[in-house]
Amino acid sequence: DTYPYADREAMAQWMARLNKEYPNFNTVGETWVTEPAYTAAWQKDSKLSNINSNLKSVMDFAFFDRINQAKNEETDGWWNGLNRVYNGLCYDYLYPNPASVMAFIENHDTDRFLGNGNDTLALKQALALLLTMNRIPQLYYGTEVLMNGTKEKTDGNVRKDFPGGFAGDKHNAFTVEG
């Protein structure tokens, strides 16, 4: 949500210099908008903007939004369930490089994918899609041990410490026993 807040021309110049100095370094810009056309305009070499951002990777909030709606829907029509995700991916042609778009199902600013529940089937399906689609997958810590929580009361509910590693922790996810 913050990348578009900065001076676009200054950021484009900064990214050009960074890319020249470190050509194998990747920078991801957070553009919290759920429409692919808007997000694609921020990716390097986009034809949708009159200023080349030189930003190699952008975050796929469209995928995040659609997969989180789809998890609560049946795929029984053209516009709901996994068809909702498919309909969003149809806009990949807008991105200069869809393989450099970073996709995710949750992060530190959102509810956990599991919310306050434990629907592991939906989580497994979402992760299977995330890890096999033409994107850079981003995994948020704790997903692998089924951490849940919502931002209903506080952001702290989705930013809890990973279980283990500190004296007094009831569970230690760093061990086989968990």
Where would I find each of the regions flagged by the language model?
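Surface-exposed cleft-lining segments at the edges of enzyme active sites
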Residues: 111-115
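A structural signal for short, well-ordered beta-strand segments and their strand-loop junctions
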Residues: 28, 104, 138-141
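Short glycine-/polar-rich loops that comprise or flank the Walker A/P-loop
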Residues: 134-136
